[in-house]
């Protein structure tokens, strides 16, 4: 079993290795951007949303981010605009040195689904460095016997810029004896050579001071200068010579400091001081001078600072041998740095998710990159995790991996996983790096809140105080943690005309319901709305319940007298013939109550009368009738005060004042008409109210009469008599309405309503009753009704 497990592991490693090779080849195609060095922080580089063909919202929702190969944050992606911005100033000379072009590699990572896009940022050079000489003074010794056209090597200037901004030319002044020549170089660098243009004469001028100027190709160009001191010597006809022009050595990068690298020696055929040779570096960069040193007498080159193959793979060192007479020779030492497996693989985590939902499959756990600074087999790597884990490694670009869950997990079986990422290189000896990740499984929100009832009925009495607690709703959630925390809310009402937001509110935490304002039963008897319970899971689950609020009526409205009108300006006078029989209907007090139920049950009673015992009021319908026969001794004018009282607790009441005029007889309606109609009809709200209320009461009264008549007809047959209203001859005003009706009285009577639209007198007049010619067999029934009327008032009329 162990051998088989080892073979499986070996197969997985080989497979990942092959995928890495394929991705390394496929990843060469990248999008290119460019930016000038030293550009300010926050400067615009490109719009990634447009280049990737994505919307800004999608870029933000998919958590786009920029990952550099060296894991440095040179760039910043603004998720609000999709713009790629500089996160820091870039110094091309520091980043790439003399390498051209200077390219920084990075990639854009998108999640849900996981995608990678490869990009390159080219840092363009600007002319921000002037040429500089390492030595402030260059000393050259030239024999006076030197022939015209002889050349002398000089130290070159250093310019950190590249391309056209780098060093381009040299000039020297004054140039009476010399000029500058720039020879062709295999490394394409510009080295100055001092050329003798006119023979020197030691006796005339033993020393010359010249200024060497180095000029770059920038716009505008920058320059640097150094002093060239020429000392004229006596004749020295042999220059030092090296056995070979090029020396090559290979040095492992772990060579200790102070170690010997090579020994370079030259020969000079001259004797004495002219045959003494000194060795120096020339045209040497700062890196060479920091890394190596040369013994000026022996020519031995030693290591001064550590070598690092991952930084510089080779050094080209120019060595000059100068004799005592000022003649010199040169050679080149090529030092090749040998790579050793001295760098273990590095694991850089770009993003990590330490908690994932238990029911999610193929969920991104970690995004990471691996890197080995070594080269060859020393830099090749194998990445793996433990077997028998429900996770797998998915390669993306070169040396980039994602750790993804393989299937939906079960938190109840195993709540956490410890994953070890192992990266091993193929060097000798093999080096490896391990990185541990602990993944926790979180519970999912799979239960919606449940109300204790599907519907609630709440009762609140009208005229309540604002912010009154009227009831509560409650819901529970079987989940745990935030998934079980319930928030309550009011849902939009189905009736769009219901101002729910101004009627009730709910406490989001405990479900308590409050009335926001005082409720009026007469305006709103009941209303329904829905409440929602939402948990705090993701995604949130919710449920709803129906709440019905019933407003209980309170006795807050007093009875309102519709007839007779109590405006005080035009008292209503009722005409009663002195020949009226007991029980004669004088008028009817009509009143309404805005309340409902027993609060709107009205009763009538005679409160005051000019002559008590002459008139009576029926308690249930407000009819005013004569209680006995009228006589000549009775006063002609009577004033009656009728009390209208509801059945509420406490009861409310109103009074109506009637004026009754006794007349000897009338055959035509006593109906005074207004002298002139108002010029303009003005709307009177009280008149409209009266018409509506009177029509409602009349309809109800008529229905009661019809029902009563139907019942009586079932018991016995009787002849129906119909009273008719006599209308005066001549033109009849259009604002008068003629109403005739038949009630349950023994007499048929007629009445007219005189309504005006203006502010004139509104009157309700009872006309002279029309006594029909009843048959003899109805006399007993009529007398029985009169007797009942007497008994209802407790009167004994002879």
UniProtKB/Swiss-Prot annotation:
User: Which organism's genome codes for this protein?
Assistant: Homo sapiens
* GO CC annotation terms, alphabetical: membrane; plasma membrane; synapse
At which residues is glycosylation annotated?
Answer: 169, 359, 418, 436, 487, 567
Against CDD domains, the record matches this protein to: Cadherin_repeat
Q: Which residues form the Cadherin domain?
A: 35-133, 138-242, 247-347, 352-451, 456-561, 568-671
Answer whether the UniProt record assigns the keyword RNA-binding to this protein: no
Q: What is its main location?
A: membrane
What's this protein's name? Protocadherin beta-14
| GO biological processes | calcium-dependent cell-cell adhesion via plasma membrane cell adhesion molecules; cell adhesion; chemical synaptic transmission; homophilic cell adhesion via plasma membrane adhesion molecules; synapse assembly
Q: Which SMART domains match?
A: CA
Matching PROSITE patterns: CADHERIN_1, CADHERIN_2
PANTHER family reported in the protein's UniProt record? CADHERIN-87A, PROTOCADHERIN BETA-14
Q: Which residues lie on this side of the membrane: Cytoplasmic?
A: 712-798
> Which subcellular locations apply to this protein?
Cell membrane
Q: What biological function has been recorded for the protein in this entry?
A: Potential calcium-dependent cell-adhesion protein. May be involved in the establishment and maintenance of specific neuronal connections in the brain.
May I ask which residue range the UniProt record assigns to the signal sequence? Answer: 1-26
Q: How does it sit in the membrane?
A: Single-pass type I membrane protein
Identify the keywords attached in UniProt to this record, alphabetized.
Calcium, Cell adhesion, Cell membrane, Disulfide bond, Glycoprotein, Membrane, Repeat, Signal, Transmembrane, Transmembrane helix
Q: Which domain of life is it from?
A: Eukaryota
| Intrachain disulfide bonds | 96-102
């Amino acid at each position: 079993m162990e051998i088989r497990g080892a073979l499986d592991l070996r197969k997985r490693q080989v497979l990942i290795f092959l995928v890495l090779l394929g991705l390394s080849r496929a990843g060469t195609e990248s999008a290119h951007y460019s930016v000038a060095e030293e550009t300010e922080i926050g400067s615009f580089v490109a719009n990634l949303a447009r280049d990737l063909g994505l919307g800004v919202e999608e870029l933000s929702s998919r958590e786009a981010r920029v990952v550099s190969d060296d894991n440095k944050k040179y760039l910043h992606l603004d998720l609000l605009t999709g713009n790629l911005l500089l996160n820091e100033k870039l110094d091309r000379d520091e980043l790439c040195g003399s390498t051209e072009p200077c390219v920084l590699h990075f990639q854009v990572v998108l999640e849900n689904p996981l995608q990678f896009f490869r990009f390159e940022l080219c840092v363009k050079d600007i002319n921000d460095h002037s040429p500089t000489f390492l030595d402030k003074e260059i000393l050259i010794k030239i024999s006076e016997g030197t022939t015209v056209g002889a050349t002398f090597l000089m130290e070159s200037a250093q310019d950190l810029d590249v391309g056209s901004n780098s060093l381009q030319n040299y000039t020297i002044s004054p140039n009476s004896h010399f000029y500058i020549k720039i020879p062709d170089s295999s490394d394409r660098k510009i080295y100055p050579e001092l050329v003798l243009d006119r023979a020197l004469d030691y006796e005339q001028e033993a020393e010359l001071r010249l200024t060497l100027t180095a000029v770059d190709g920038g716009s505008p160009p920058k320059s640097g200068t150094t002093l060239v001191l020429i000392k004229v010597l006596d004749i020295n006809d042999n220059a030092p010579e090296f056995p070979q022009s090029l020396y090559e050595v290979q040095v492992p990068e772990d060579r200790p400091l102070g170690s010997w690298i090579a020994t370079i020696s030259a020969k000079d055929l001259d004797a004495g001081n002219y045959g003494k040779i000194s060795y120096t570096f020339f045209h040497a960069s700062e890196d060479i001078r920091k890394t190596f040193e040369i013994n000026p007498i022996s020519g031995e080159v030693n290591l001064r600072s550590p070598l690092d193959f991952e930084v510089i793979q080779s050094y080209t060192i120019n060595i000059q041998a100068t004799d005592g007479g000022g003649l010199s020779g040169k050679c080149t030492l090529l030092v090749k740095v040998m790579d050793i497996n001295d760098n273990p693989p590095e694991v850089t985590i770009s993003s990590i998710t330490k908690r994932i939902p238990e029911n999610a499959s193929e969920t991104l756990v970690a995004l990471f990159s691996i890197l080995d600074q070594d080269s060859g087999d020393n830099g090749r790597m194998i990445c793996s995790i433990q077997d028998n884990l429900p996770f797998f490694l998915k390669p993306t670009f070169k040396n980039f991996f994602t750790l993804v869950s393989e299937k939906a997990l079960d938190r109840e079986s195993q709540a956490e996983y410890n994953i070890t990422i192992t990266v091993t290189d193929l060097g000798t000896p093999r080096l490896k790096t391990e990185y541990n990740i602990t993944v926790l499984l979180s519970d999912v929100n799979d239960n919606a809140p449940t109300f204790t009832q599907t519907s609630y009925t709440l009762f609140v009495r009208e005229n309540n105080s604002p912010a009154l607690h009227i009831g509560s709703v409650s819901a529970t959630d079987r989940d745990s943690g935030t998934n079980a925390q319930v928030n309550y809310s009011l849902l939009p009402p189905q009736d769009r005309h219901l101002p729910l937001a101004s009627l009730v509110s709910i406490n989001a935490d405990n479900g308590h319901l409050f009335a926001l304002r005082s409720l009026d039963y007469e305006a709103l008897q009941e209303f329904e709305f829905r409440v929602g319970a939402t948990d705090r899971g993701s995604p949130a689950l919710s449920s709803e319940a129906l709440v019905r609020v019933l407003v209980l009526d309170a006795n807050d409205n007093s009875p309102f007298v519709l007839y007779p009108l109590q405006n005080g300006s035009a008292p209503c006078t009722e005409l009663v013939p002195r020949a009226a029989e007991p029980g004669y209907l004088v008028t009817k007090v009509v009143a309404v109550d805005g309340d409902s139920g027993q609060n709107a049950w009205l009763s009538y009673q005679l409160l005051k009368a000019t002559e008590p015992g002459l008139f009576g009021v029926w308690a249930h319908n407000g009819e005013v009738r004569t209680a006995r026969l009228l006589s000549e001794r009775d006063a002609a004018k009577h004033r009656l005060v009728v009390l209208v009282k509801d059945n509420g607790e406490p009861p409310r009441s109103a009074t109506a004042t009637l004026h009754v005029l006794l007349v000897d007889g009338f055959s035509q309606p006593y109906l005074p008409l207004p002298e002139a109609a108002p010029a303009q009809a003005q709307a009177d709200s009280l008149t409209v109210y009266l018409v509506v209320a009177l029509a409602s009461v009349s309809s109800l009264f008529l229905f009661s009469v019809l029902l009563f008549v139907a019942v009586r007809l079932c018991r016995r047959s009787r002849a129906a008599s119909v009273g008719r209203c006599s209308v005066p001859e001549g033109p009849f005003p259009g604002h008068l309405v003629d109403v005739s009706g038949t009630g349950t009285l023994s007499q048929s009577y007629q009445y007219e309503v005189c309504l005006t639209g203006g502010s004139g007198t509104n009157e309700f007049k009872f006309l002279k009753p029309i006594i029909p010619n009843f048959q003899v067999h109805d006399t007993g029934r009529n007398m029985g009704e009169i007797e009942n009327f007497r008994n209802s008032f407790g009167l004994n009329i002879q």
